[in-house]
Amino acid sequence: METFEESSDLDVIQKHLFEDLMIPDGFIEDFVFDDTAFVSGLWSLEPFNPVPKLEPSSPVLDPDSYVQEILQMEAESSSSSSTTTSPEVETVSNRKKTKRFEETRHYRGVRRRPWGKFAAEIRDPAKKGSRIWLGTFESDIDAARAYDYAAFKLRGRKAVLNFPLDAGKYDAPVNSCRKRRRTDVPQPQGTTTSTSSSSSN
């Protein structure tokens, strides 16, 4: 049985919840309801067909028949879906398989050039963050090692490195990509440059 406190608590909750739903008395009197429109709307509906009674022995209530029908539908849908595949779907799936995304790791201080080489640089805190060029490398790992070497020399143990376990183990990597140098172009024989000065009288 409920105690007085429990029932009063329930009454307070009920009053709080349903108080907003109370309909004022004037609302019902002012509300105009046209029953003729409602009744004429009912007559325009189609006649109601009740659901026929099923006998317990009917196949509709037999669970085994349901299982067999479901299995038949699944077999039909799988055979029809395999024969009606569109070429557009196949080409899209083939494109996805043929596209191969290279997963490359982004190393600190390394940028990839559009032509495929890797540039390494570091900012020098002593010179207001100006960049120090470390070189251009064939692989991103070589460029990252160059950055690590320079960072370790500049900042010491506080340096944030790409390969922290290799700190101080390697020498400075050699810049594998060199700038193009001009080769001395031989000049045609008709033009000579004289280095000797001619004496004039």
UniProtKB/Swiss-Prot annotation:
<feature type="DNA-binding region" description="AP2/ERF">
    <location>
        <begin position="106"/>
        <end position="164"/>
    </location>
</feature>
<feature type="region of interest" description="Disordered">
    <location>
        <begin position="73"/>
        <end position="105"/>
    </location>
</feature>
<dbReference type="GO" id="GO:0019760">
    <property type="term" value="P:glucosinolate metabolic process"/>
</dbReference>
<keyword id="KW-0936">Ethylene signaling pathway</keyword>
<keyword id="KW-0238">DNA-binding</keyword>
<comment type="function">
    <text>Probably acts as a transcriptional activator. Binds to the GCC-box pathogenesis-related promoter element. May be involved in the regulation of gene expression by stress factors and by components of stress signal transduction pathways.</text>
</comment>
<comment type="similarity">
    <text>Belongs to the AP2/ERF transcription factor family. ERF subfamily.</text>
</comment>
<feature type="compositionally biased region" description="Low complexity">
    <location>
        <begin position="74"/>
        <end position="92"/>
    </location>
</feature>
<dbReference type="InterPro" id="IPR036955">
    <property type="entry name" value="AP2/ERF_dom_sf"/>
</dbReference>
<dbReference type="GO" id="GO:1904277">
    <property type="term" value="P:negative regulation of wax biosynthetic process"/>
</dbReference>
<dbReference type="Pfam" id="PF00847">
    <property type="entry name" value="AP2"/>
</dbReference>
<dbReference type="InterPro" id="IPR016177">
    <property type="entry name" value="DNA-bd_dom_sf"/>
</dbReference>
<keyword id="KW-0805">Transcription regulation</keyword>
<keyword id="KW-0804">Transcription</keyword>
<keyword id="KW-0010">Activator</keyword>
<dbReference type="GO" id="GO:0009873">
    <property type="term" value="P:ethylene-activated signaling pathway"/>
</dbReference>
<protein>
    <recommendedName>
        <fullName>Ethylene-responsive transcription factor ERF107</fullName>
    </recommendedName>
</protein>
<dbReference type="GO" id="GO:0005634">
    <property type="term" value="C:nucleus"/>
</dbReference>
<dbReference type="InterPro" id="IPR044808">
    <property type="entry name" value="ERF_plant"/>
</dbReference>
<dbReference type="GO" id="GO:0000976">
    <property type="term" value="F:transcription cis-regulatory region binding"/>
</dbReference>
<keyword id="KW-0539">Nucleus</keyword>
<dbReference type="InterPro" id="IPR001471">
    <property type="entry name" value="AP2/ERF_dom"/>
</dbReference>
<feature type="compositionally biased region" description="Low complexity">
    <location>
        <begin position="191"/>
        <end position="201"/>
    </location>
</feature>
<feature type="region of interest" description="Disordered">
    <location>
        <begin position="169"/>
        <end position="201"/>
    </location>
</feature>
<dbReference type="GO" id="GO:0003700">
    <property type="term" value="F:DNA-binding transcription factor activity"/>
</dbReference>
<dbReference type="GO" id="GO:0009414">
    <property type="term" value="P:response to water deprivation"/>
</dbReference>
<dbReference type="GO" id="GO:0045893">
    <property type="term" value="P:positive regulation of DNA-templated transcription"/>
</dbReference>
